[in-house]
A protein has these predicted regions:
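Conserved GNAT acetyl-CoA-binding A-motif
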Residues: 93, 100-112
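Conserved acetyl-CoA binding element of GNAT-fold acetyltransferases
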Residues: 69-81, 133
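Conserved acetyl-CoA pyrophosphate-binding loop and the N-cap/start of the following alpha-helix
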Residues: 83, 87-95
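Acetyl-CoA-dependent GNAT
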Residues: 7-11, 15-69, 75, 138-139
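Conserved G/P- and acidic residue-centered "switch" motifs that form tight phosphate/ATP-binding loops
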Residues: 9, 51, 87-89, 104
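Hydrophobic adenine-recognition pocket in adenosine-nucleotide-binding enzymes
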Residues: 5, 77-79, 112
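Residue-level recognition of the GNAT/N-acetyltransferase active site
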Residues: 62, 80, 84, 113
Length: 140
C-alpha cells in the first residue's frame, strides 16, 4: 500500500536513508521531516507491507529556466533490501507520477548514484532516460 508519510515514520525512514548510503538517525529524520512537511512543494510517499514501511519516495517540484513546464524531482527513492523486486518500487513510482500529473507537472527528473546500476536499470525500465551527469560540492 502507498500512503503519505507522517512524522511517526521518522525512525523507519531514517533506516531507509541509511540503507541508501546516507547515515541518518531518527532524531535527524524528524527534523528533516518538519522542514519538508512545512514546504508545499514537497511530497513524501511510503510503501507499506503488513504495517511496516518497505520503501519511500520523496519529491519536490519547481519552475524551470529551460522550459515552461513545471519540473518534478524525485529527491529520494529507496526500497528496503528485503522488499526489492516485489513491486513496492513500481507502486511508489506510479504514485509519484500520478501526484505530479494531478498538479500539472509534465517533466520528472531524478539522480541516482553511479554505483546504483540496478536502480539505473529500474528507472530505464519505467521509461526514464539518462540525460547527463550530476556534480556536487560541499561548501565549507
Amino acid at each position: 500500500m502507498i500512503r503519505a508519510a507522517v512524522m511517526a515514520d521518522a525512525p523507519q525512514l531514517a533506516a531507509l536513508m541509511t540503507q541508501l548510503g546516507y547515515p541518518t538517525q531518527a532524531k535527524e529524520m524528524r527534523a528533516r521531516l518538519r522542514s519538508i512537511f512545512s514546504d508545499n512543494s514537497f511530497r513524501t510517499f511510503v510503501a507499506t507491507d503488513d504495517e511496516q514501511i518497505v520503501g519511500m519516495a520523496g519529491t519536490s517540484e519547481h519552475a524551470s529556466y529551460e522550459h515552461d513546464d513545471r519540473t518534478g524531482r524525485i529527491v529520494a527513492m529507496v526500497v528496503s533490501d528485503n522488499a526489492q523486486r516485489k513491486g513496492a518500487g513500481r507502486q511508489l513510482m506510479r504514485a509519484v507520477e500520478k501526484s505530479f500529473r494531478r498538479r500539472g507537472v509534465r517533466r520528472i527528473v531524478l539522480n541516482a548514484r553511479l554505483e546504483r546500476v540496478e536502480a539505473h536499470q529500474f528507472y530505464e525500465a519505467l521509461g526514464y532516460r539518462k540525460t547527463g551527469w550530476r556534480f556536487a560540492k560541499l561548501l565549507e
